[in-house]
Amino acid sequence: MKQSVSAEQIELKSSLPGSKKVYVDGPREGMKVPMREIEQSDTNGVPNPPIRVYDTSGPYTDPAYKVELEKGIPTPRHSWILERGDVEAYEGREVKPEDDGVKVASKHTPVFPQMDRKPLRAKQGANVTQMHYARNGIITSEMEYVAIREGVDPEFVRKEIAEGRAILPANINHPEAEPMIIGRNFHVKVNANIGNSAVSSSIAEEVEKMTWATRWGADTIMDLSTGKNIHTTREWIIRNAPVPVGTVPIYQALEKVNGIAEDLTWEVYRDTLIEQAEQGVDYFTIHAGVLLRYIPITAKRTTGIVSRGGSIMAQWCLFHHKENFLYTHFEEICEIMKQYDVSFSLGDGLRPGSIADANDEAQFSELETLGELTKIAWKHDVQVMIEGPGHVPMHLIKENMEKELDICQGAPFYTLGPLTTDIAPGYDHITSAIGAAMIGWFGTAMLCYVTPKEHLGLPNKDDVREGVITYKIAAHAADLAKGHKTAHQRDDALSKARFEFRWRDQFNLSLDPERAMEYHDETLPAEGAKTAHFCSMCGPKFCSMRISHDIREYAKENDLETTEAIEKGMKEKAKEFKETGSHLYQ
């Protein structure tokens, strides 16, 4: 792992063009909630107000912050956690070479240079989940923070968490994370998957992907590493992550038994859960709904079982002809989760991997089991969200949302797309964003991004950016459709800037200012083009917005309403046409 950050990397972490990091003071001393403020230029001397938008970039876009990845980022939640008086520090488990998939610990890659902290856990008999606090009428500092980010009342946040309609993923060992909420009555969130594989990527690359993804708007990160250095990669990511981090613990557990699924045991898996909870993982994808009796149903599918976690557990169940140990030990898993406030992301191990398999018996059988497990988790006051498909044609998407809300008692839905067609490898960020926008509108709380590399390879930095931006579009479109009270403000500001030919404001208000300016400047690179009343699409003579301005100006000069001006202008042009001989071409 590189021990320093280059000037180029620091530049990449600067704020987006035309923006600056601002902070809103919270109700308690020292609480500062980050926002991104987009400046706007005046319109004929009349000021246009700055637009504040949700910010996930962490301290990296604060010019006062010095980036030192080897030290990690600030820990704003640490004092809040300790003040509640229900946690204790302890030695924790010893980091073993097999945690990183090796037999001998590496001498070159420290787990983390600043590893002087002890993990926290709940005191004997205590429950430290945000759901437990909410159900006991307590509005935590995390809930107050979230309320400011979302523009809602803290009591509303508490109630949504208490009722299970939202989760606030916030492991007590990840104090670096800026609190956020996932629920259908809040902004639709976007998750970005990162992680190495056995054949590609390094620790440094994955940390950079994390900071890159959050810069472009990823609300959470999932580390899906399956290669070497799993533990170390995760430690570096968590210590530098301003957003919640999720994992699929079965991946690392499998590495510990040399990739042989049938050698997995509950003991190995349990040890992995504790290892990751001590590091600070905020939510676990756990495929406890893949039951032995469901596996034969998948035999008639076009694409069988496509979930990695689902296929691992199916293989274990068939080899031993026993029930899924994640299901049989679920109560014990809940006991671990509530000691650290790790949220469940109940995995859809039998999700459809093709349009042909959408909404089939296997998929919905597993969903019924996830509903059952949700009730058990809630009995322990453990937070839960439900993972969803997958590959689903547009006319079958709504049924997924309706069934999830009914079967899982309104727990937040977290979906991978869904992809609405199977014919576009290389463009599956688009095929899935169509489904993501729809299911977000119907009520999904968080969308898992898909990159152009889906089904083809491990995404690089550019793919991560493309995936995040594509899914921010889908999430925002869903917020607009749901009538979120602040969603339209940015659209209205950009539309006004567009009509007034304020090109730089158009770029800066967009989700990807750099891309917008790049495309504009391909054909009109001159600085004067930034104030021109046309673009290269229509040119100066055929710009519809310029013509609209001319009509308005004509109406103003002749003291007419706009519709009257159009009618009068038409009559004058008709008269002129006749007077010049009624020739079509002059």
From Swiss-Prot:
* Keyword Ubl conjugation among record annotations: no
Residues annotated to bind [4Fe-4S] cluster: C535, C538, C543
Annotated EC: 4.1.99.17
Cofactor(s) it depends on: [4Fe-4S] cluster
User: Part of which pathway?
Assistant: Cofactor biosynthesis; thiamine diphosphate biosynthesis
Query: Entry cofactor note text?
Result: Binds 1 [4Fe-4S] cluster per subunit. The cluster is coordinated with 3 cysteines and an exchangeable S-adenosyl-L-methionine.
Q: Which GO terms describe its molecular function?
A: 4 iron, 4 sulfur cluster binding; carbon-carbon lyase activity; zinc ion binding
Catalytic activity, as annotated? 5-amino-1-(5-phospho-beta-D-ribosyl)imidazole + S-adenosyl-L-methionine = 4-amino-2-methyl-5-(phosphooxymethyl)pyrimidine + CO + 5'-deoxyadenosine + formate + L-methionine + 3 H(+)
Q: Does the record bear Lyase in its keywords?
A: yes
Annotated Zn(2+) binding lies at: H391, H455
Tell me the InterPro entries matching this sequence: ThiC (IPR037509), ThiC-associated_dom (IPR025747), ThiC/Bza_core_dom (IPR038521), ThiC/BzaA/B (IPR002817)
Enumerate the UniProt keywords alphabetically. Answer: 4Fe-4S, Iron, Iron-sulfur, Lyase, Metal-binding, S-adenosyl-L-methionine, Thiamine biosynthesis, Zinc
User: Where along the chain is substrate bound?
Assistant: N193, M222, Y251, H287, S307, R308, G309, D348, G349, L350, R351, E387, Y414
Residues annotated as signal peptide:
none
Ranges for the region named Disordered are 1-59
Give Gene Ontology CC terms. Answer: cytosol
Q: Which family does it belong to?
A: Belongs to the ThiC family.
Fetch the PANTHER family from UniProt. Answer: PHOSPHOMETHYLPYRIMIDINE SYNTHASE, CHLOROPLASTIC, THIAMINE BIOSYNTHESIS PROTEIN THIC
Write down the HAMAP family for this protein, in alphabetical order.
ThiC (MF_00089)
- Record's NCBIfam families? PRK09284.1, PRK13352.1, thiC
Q: What is this protein called?
A: Phosphomethylpyrimidine synthase
Origin species:
Bacillus cereus (strain AH820)
Q: Which gene encodes it?
A: thiC
